[in-house]
């Protein structure tokens, strides 16, 4: 008999980000092992974009209790700390129903960057949100330690990520007249992209793949950057494959799925030595971390692309599914 997993998320299923990508990529393995995945997301309700952070949708789920009862899931997972997550937490706690949660995004840091709200205010809220979860799944060992340092319990689990190797793989590359420096992701303030755009690196072409709330502003502000919009599947892989270095300037990501997509294509990564990169990059093998991004790029150019690819093989969506499945608890 097929077992039902219910995932409650404040992201729409067609959004392009690391959270949505993660759940989409474990679905085939869930189906293989006799599980089906249902979603409660803002698409079921009327919603508005969160100001300054339109990745998060604000929906009022007036019939969420009824929806959960109708789905009658065997397991429940709350993916995000938004409105839907809050309403689900309330219902599940009142009825003493088991569930687990995920910590995907460094919200305290992002909220401080976007709205100026002190982290001393948001960390207690995040800790409270996850306090009744049977297991808190987060991206890396360093994130586990950070959550513990903010008062989380011992039920935190490292939930690794993967990459679709049918799409993201090395290919024959053309010789670029200029160095191609690439970033892929949400075009927004908290991604720290201006450190990449402002960088005065010689004889290079900077390419930005992705959309976001700051896209129009950055197009005006940085005419030398080639903004190409959202790309998916083979078209996205082509940008990774043809880039000389993937530049990851973010200081607030818990992981950075785009880094391992780049590595799977053989493209080395240049990044700051912060959470996310320190857990993903094998320094001086798959990329270079340095407090000076230009220095990181210069050193990354000397790395062997075959070694970059070979080291990336450890990232597997099947392994990600196994960890997710192993931390499910019965909701009945």
Question: Which stretches of residues belong to each language-model region?
Answer:
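Conserved donor-binding/catalytic core segment of Leloir-type glycosyltransferases
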Residues: 8, 174-207
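Nucleotide-sugar donor phosphate/pyrophosphate-binding loop at the beta->alpha transition
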Residues: 98-100, 109-128, 165
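Donor nucleotide-sugar binding/catalytic pocket of nucleotide-sugar-dependent glycosyltransferases
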Residues: 124-170
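Short alpha-helical donor nucleotide-sugar binding micro-motif in glycosyltransferases
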Residues: 130, 230-231, 238-243, 324
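Nucleotide-activated donor-binding/catalytic signature segment of Leloir-type glycosyltransferases, i.e.
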Residues: 216-234
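Aromatic "clamp/platform" in nucleotide-sugar-dependent glycosyltransferases that forms part
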Residues: 251
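Short hydrophobic beta-strand element within catalytic cores of glycosyltransferases
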Residues: 259, 268-271
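A charged, aromatic-enriched C-terminal amphipathic alpha-helix characteristic of glycosyltransferases
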Residues: 302-331
